[in-house]
Amino acid sequence: MSAETPINVVGGGAWGTALANAAAGAGHPVTLWLRDAGAAAALQAQRENPRYLPGVPLHPAIRATGEAVDLAGARATLLVVPAQTVRGVLESLRGPLATAGPVILCAKGIERGSDSFMSAVAEQVLPSGTPVAVLSGPSFAIDVARGLPTAVTLAAADAGRAAALSALLSGPSFRLYHTDDVRGVEIGGAGKNVLAIACGIVAGRGLGESARAALIARAFAELMRFARPFGGRPETLMGLSGLGDLVLTASSPQSRNFAFGQRLGAGASPAEAAGGKLAEGAFTAAALAGLAAAKGIEMPVAAAVAAIVAGTASVDDVIAGLLARPLRGETD
């Protein structure tokens, strides 16, 4: 394809807009698709996303559209929609995506009901042989949109494709490292959202920085235990998409998952804590805990978050239960 063949970004939220800016900053024309044609027209006219990224200009190389036909014939397509909507969006765009290059999944989560990771969902929906990749790592949309230095991981089963896509999307301030460990990257992204809620609860309860540091370390140990039976590699979890993303989202109120947990810790109900905003970890918690239980993987922090979100346990009872667990070797 020519250098003028666009890169698609499907999804006009904060992260989709930020990735569109990053791809345009890497020297590519970008087609930014929004489900709402009116919102797409407004974005195209205003050259800004006032709802999600007010004050951040849209790169001149971005064209916003609400027409699915505009997605055909791209070099690659970044799917940037919430994890629980990935299947529906892929089904609705299956036709144009057949000629839209590799599909890069940017949602971090596990589908409720099927307990499927995002790459598995894509493989179930897209035509056989459609190349699929996953992008994940420590990144806030506002930082990427403003061109602040950020590094993430791109994974594809074909190592050569992973390297090529990373090179395609990397720019002056947005660096992509590549791997063929798709499942390891997905586990890091989905799992850290759940564990970031736990860290937010600790902050909201005023339990101190020492408690939060201990929780981050123990939560990371849970991710490592979970990854092995599902084929994720330890070195992947120790990189950007695992430990890097966990540290970022477990330490900052900019993270929706951390902020959700913080409100839970301060006494809000799950519905009140959500406040109409998406916290992917709230949807992933039950799936993560269920998958772990089915394989006999001990994940007490993830299970505690799932119970709190489901309303079957109180924050105080969960904290008391975790503190009463038997002492053990640190690496057991």
From Swiss-Prot:
Active site (catalytic residues): 192 (proton acceptor)
Pfam families assigned to the protein according to its UniProt record, in alphabetical order: NAD_Gly3P_dh_C (PF07479), NAD_Gly3P_dh_N (PF01210)
Catalytic reaction list: sn-glycerol 3-phosphate + NAD(+) = dihydroxyacetone phosphate + NADH + H(+); sn-glycerol 3-phosphate + NADP(+) = dihydroxyacetone phosphate + NADPH + H(+)
Keywords from the UniProt entry: Cytoplasm, Lipid biosynthesis, Lipid metabolism, NAD, NADP, Nucleotide-binding, Oxidoreductase, Phospholipid biosynthesis, Phospholipid metabolism
Lipid metabolism keyword on record: yes
Pathway info: Membrane lipid metabolism; glycerophospholipid metabolism
Record-listed NADPH binding positions: 15, 35, 108, 141, 256, 278, 280
InterPro entries from the UniProt entry: 6-PGluconate_DH-like_C_sf, 6PGD_dom2, G3P_DH_NAD-dep, G3P_DH_NAD-dep_C, G3P_DH_NAD-dep_N, NAD(P)-bd_dom_sf
UniProt keyword annotation of Coiled coil present: no
EC number: 1.1.1.94
Single GO BP term: phospholipid biosynthetic process
Any one GO MF annotation of this record: NAD binding
Residues the entry annotates as binding sn-glycerol 3-phosphate: 108, 137, 139, 192, 245, 255-257
Locations listed in the record: Cytoplasm
An example Gene Ontology CC term for this record: cytosol
Top EC class for this record: oxidoreductase
Family note: Belongs to the NAD-dependent glycerol-3-phosphate dehydrogenase family.
Function: Catalyzes the reduction of the glycolytic intermediate dihydroxyacetone phosphate (DHAP) to sn-glycerol 3-phosphate (G3P), the key precursor for phospholipid synthesis.
Protein name from the UniProt record: Glycerol-3-phosphate dehydrogenase [NAD(P)+]
Gene: gpsA
